[in-house]
């Protein structure tokens, strides 16, 4: 996913984006765990995506320092998008988990509509993205995830988790078949 994102951002298609935005990409935050087969947990057995609300400098250093990067960037200019990239083990396609404002008065409804613009644009531009898989909530038990902690602490409205299925997109007869040996082949296109 990150390779595809970087390739796109460096392509002529993203020239206009590069003119208006500065992109900061923090690579994999759990390399030690992944090397030993843990895609969620560090070598200490900590699910690092559940430590974003109060990361410990010594127990969760990748999260602690990633938040420091965001804090530093916020001092320089407004951060308009935070996106945590994940692989999903059950659902197919690509989809976003986002946040929402609890104020359902007029202003809250407008802000909540704005939160859906980036996912909607992705769905319109790429058949791998499915709006029906997207969720925009502040659920119990998710307060310590990256998207929720960043949304609340830094007031970054566009704070998302982008999930891409380990199994590719839904197998639809009208669409290309999924390469079962490389489920991310379609994402690289």
Whereabouts are the PLM-identified features?
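Structured catalytic-domain cores with a bias toward divalent-metal coordination
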Residues: 1-189
């Amino acid at each position: 996913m990150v390779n595809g994102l970087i390739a796109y951002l460096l392509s002529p298609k993203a020239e206009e984006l590069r003119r208006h935005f500065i992109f900061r990409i923090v690579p994999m935050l759990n390399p030690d765990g992944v090397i030993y087969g843990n895609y969620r947990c560090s070598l200490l057995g900590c699910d690092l995506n559940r430590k974003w609300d109060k990361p410990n400098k010594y127990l969760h250093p990748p999260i602690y320092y990633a938040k420091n990067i965001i804090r530093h960037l916020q001092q320089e200019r407004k951060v308009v998008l935070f996106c945590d990239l994940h692989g999903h083990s059950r659902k197919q396609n690509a989809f976003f988990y986002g946040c929402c404002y609890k104020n359902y008065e007029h202003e809250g409804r407008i802000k909540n509509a704005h939160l859906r613009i980036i996912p909607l644009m992705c769905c319109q531009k790429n058949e791998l993205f499915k709006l029906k898989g997207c969720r925009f909530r502040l659920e119990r038990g998710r307060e310590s995830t990256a998207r929720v902690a960043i949304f609340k602490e830094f007031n970054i409205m566009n704070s998302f988790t982008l999930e891409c299925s380990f199994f590719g997109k839904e197998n639809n007869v009208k669409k290309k078949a999924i390469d079962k040996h490389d489920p991310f082949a379609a994402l690289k296109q």
